[in-house]
Amino acid sequence: MDIRPIEGLEFSFPQAESDVLPSLPMRMLALGNSGSGKTTTLINLITDPRFYGKRPWERVYWCSPTAAADDALEPLRRYVEDVLKQDQEVDPTFHDHIDVAFLTKVIERQRKITERMKAMTPRPKKGFGILVVIDDLADARRNVLQSGQLVDSLFIKARHWGVSTILSTQKLRLPLISPCVRVNVTCVIVYRLRSKYEKTQYLEEYSA
């Protein structure tokens, strides 16, 4: 019997030509010590067209304690202004903490955009993708419960609405990196770790 796949309502997103890079929407974990090069790697991944093309995301949001002062973010600042034309007054890219209320609205907006696009006739083939980066905030003490729920939602549900998420951290076992987050990761970039213990933690988690 010839069983044909049911046509779904999924949209296509720009993808990397390399099999090493994860497909979009992605859920990435960047694990490494301070100064290991995580931020530089992520900036290049976002802005360099050799990875995912010129414009893989329509909006980018970057949460980091040094979001306003870090010179390493300058290429991203130029990218969101010159390429994405993202209005920094209305829809700011950079946040110095996990702004739960703001990001919740962003995710809800993505859900509505996706549902509206699915209802269109003819239905668009290309999805409206965005990227949320949480950089060195996995050990944040501010609004831990609400922030944890938001991060869980980003790694579990938000991908269905075209949301890619990157969590950059120095340690694997922290309050915001819940078991739900760890099992839903689609890509891990690991740098030199601080100790053999941290290396063992990583291997126990991901070397099944």
Which stretches of residues belong to each language-model region?
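Short acidic-hydrophobic, aromatic-tinged amphipathic segments that line or gate anion-handling sites
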Residues: V83-A101
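Phosphate-binding P-loop
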Residues: S12, A16-P25, Y52
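Short, aromatic/basic amphipathic alpha-helical patches
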Residues: A72-V83
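Conserved P-loop NTPase motor cores
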Residues: P14, M28-P49, E58, P65-A69, ...
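N-terminal pre-Walker A segment at the start of P-loop NTPase domains
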Residues: M1-A16, A67
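Alpha-helical structural elements
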Residues: I6-G8, Y52, E89, H97
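Active-site catalytic pocket residues across diverse enzymes, especially alpha/beta-hydrolases
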Residues: P49-R50, V80
